[in-house]
Amino acid sequence: EIFRQYSNEGALYFSDDFELSDELKVNAGLRYSSFQHRGDINLFTYLKNDLTLSNDNYRNIEPRLSLRYKLNTTSSIKGSYSENYQYIHLASTSSVSLPTDLWVPSSTGIKPKFAKQYALGYFKNFNDNMFETSLEGYYKEMTNLIEYREGYLPEDNTNSSSDDSFTFGDGDSYGIEVLLKKNRGKTTGWIGYTLSKTTRYFDEVNNGIEFPAKYDRRHDLSIT
């Protein structure tokens, strides 16, 4: 037997730029997303082909807004806010990394992941734009996250689409990003460093105490 799940997803996006003054520019956008889960379970055997249909539909509006305030000819402040729905979840265990982690579509029992993100940064160029520097902070809050219940292994769910396999919770992520970029000369490239923290909160995991996300990376240094 092979169990499969199917879904359709589509989106429309609109955005526009507004110059409110010589110093202040705004970009506003709106994304409309639609998701349909087609079939709770598709069961194929040598003798029978059964299809159980589901009419789980999600339609959401996702606003985005960014602002840029020019301090002078070489420096500016930028801020942004965005909302995002994710309809496909990566179901994993918090304790171990296994190659059997599964992508699971939203359904009646599994709501779409929802995230809000805020960002604010300072940007400055030097030597006639030869060098670019920036310091940016961000905060992201997430709801409707999923993980396997404690004591439940992903391979136990390989032949089942039961929503009872999962537990649901929230999370957040925040950090500071520093970037130095050289645009001209014999040597070009950039150096970036990120200090961040990503946590999860599940009532049924770790006794309800917050814990680091599976893919939390406290320090990240990139050189190109």
Segments from the language model and where they lie:
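Outer-membrane beta-barrel channels and translocator barrels
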Residues: 21-25, 70-74, 115, 126-129, ...
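Extracellular loop and loop/strand-boundary signature of outer-membrane beta-barrel proteins
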Residues: 1-2, 15, 46-54, 102-108, ...
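Signature of Gram-negative outer-membrane beta-barrel scaffolds
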Residues: 1-72, 87-88, 205
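Residues on the lipid-exposed face of transmembrane beta-strands in outer-membrane beta-barrel proteins
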Residues: 12-16, 65-69, 110, 120-124, ...
